[in-house]
């Protein structure tokens, strides 16, 4: 972690969760400070169908809510899409943009991700901008060049430490149980900090860099001890309060 940066533990429920799942949110909200301490932030990005209810449940807790995607436009004939303003209207404070599953399933390019980040800012949301290399790119030794290209294309010039969070998610590690080595994560996050510094100047010094990719209670302590890893973007492990809080505990006192 970076000593001067307040860590963020973010959960991404993806396409999981119905009303019966809301009890897990209550447990996360009530247990977060005890687990992570008062010096960390938490957010759960739920499906749009749960967002308003999740926001009500977490309203008096230190855990915020977020969306998982937004359309660049404020409104219009975009059936099935959700504007950032609509997420904010449901109580969201954050929104994930550019997740690898969106890039793959919906063929989103870097410029699409940048437009969504700007839409998030317009609505007063913090954008969690996701980047990361595929297995083929990794095996070809292209990890750092891919990250440079995605920082250049996916992070708009107006990004600040307040309106943006960067999440590094090696695509090959998501949902597979595989994680890069400590050395690989450290190298990637140091590279991201340097690239952001060249693009954004001093703002990059305070920007939170999250690691995402099969984060679980058993590896959270090691991952969150790495310099420039300022929190985590958690997938499956965020669906259960016990797992999310166990991961959150890894930042306590750091």
From Swiss-Prot:
InterPro entries attached to this UniProt entry: Aldolase_TIM, TIM_sf, TrioseP_Isoase_bac/euk, Triosephosphate_isomerase, Triosephosphate_isomerase_AS
Highest taxon above the source species: Bacteria
Residues where substrate binds: 12-14, 175, 214, 235-236
Protein's pathway: Carbohydrate biosynthesis; gluconeogenesis; Carbohydrate degradation; glycolysis; D-glyceraldehyde 3-phosphate from glycerone phosphate: step 1/1
GO biological process assignments: gluconeogenesis; glyceraldehyde-3-phosphate biosynthetic process; glycerol catabolic process; glycolytic process
Reactions performed catalytically: D-glyceraldehyde 3-phosphate = dihydroxyacetone phosphate
A GO cellular component entry from the record: cytosol
Major location category of this protein: cytoplasm
EC number of the protein: 5.3.1.1
A GO MF term: triose-phosphate isomerase activity
Active-site feature positions: 99 (electrophile), 169 (proton acceptor)
Location(s), subcellular: Cytoplasm
Keywords, in A-Z order: Cytoplasm, Gluconeogenesis, Glycolysis, Isomerase
NCBIfam families the UniProt entry points to: tim (TIGR00419)
Function per UniProt: Involved in the gluconeogenesis. Catalyzes stereospecifically the conversion of dihydroxyacetone phosphate (DHAP) to D-glyceraldehyde-3-phosphate (G3P).
Subunit organization: Homodimer.
UniProt similarity note: Belongs to the triosephosphate isomerase family.
Protein name: Triosephosphate isomerase
The gene coding this protein: tpiA
């Amino acid at each position: 972690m970076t000593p001067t940066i307040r860590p963020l533990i973010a959960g991404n429920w993806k396409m999981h969760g119905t009303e019966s799942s809301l009890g897990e949110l209550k447990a996360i909200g009530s247990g977060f400070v005890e687990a992570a301490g008062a010096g960390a932030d938490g957010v759960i990005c739920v499906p749009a169908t749960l967002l308003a209810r999740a926001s009500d449940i977490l309203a008096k807790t230190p855990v915020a809510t977020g969306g998982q995607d937004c359309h660049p436009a404020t409104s219009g004939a975009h059936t099935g899409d959700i504007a950032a303003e609509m997420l904010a209207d449901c109580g969201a404070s954050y929104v994930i943009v550019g997740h690898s599953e969106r890039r793959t399933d919906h063929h989103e390019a870097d410029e699409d991700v940048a437009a969504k980040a700007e839409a998030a800012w317009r609505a007063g949301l913090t954008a969690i901008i996701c980047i990361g290399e595929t297995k083929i790119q990794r095996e070809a030794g292209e990890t750092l060049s891919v990250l440079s290209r995605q920082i250049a294309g996916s992070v708009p010039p107006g990004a600040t430490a307040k309106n943006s969070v960067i999440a590094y998610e090696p695509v090959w590690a998501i949902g597979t149980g595989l994680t890069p080595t400590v050395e690989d994560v450290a190298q990637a996050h140091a590279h991201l900090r340097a690239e952001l510094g060249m693009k954004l100047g001093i703002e990059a010094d305070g920007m939170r860099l999250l690691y995402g990719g099969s984060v679980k209670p058993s590896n959270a302590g090691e991952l969150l001890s790495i310099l420039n890893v300022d929190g985590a973007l958690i997938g499956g492990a965020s669906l259960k309060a016990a797992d999310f809080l166990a991961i959150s505990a890894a930042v306590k006192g750091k």
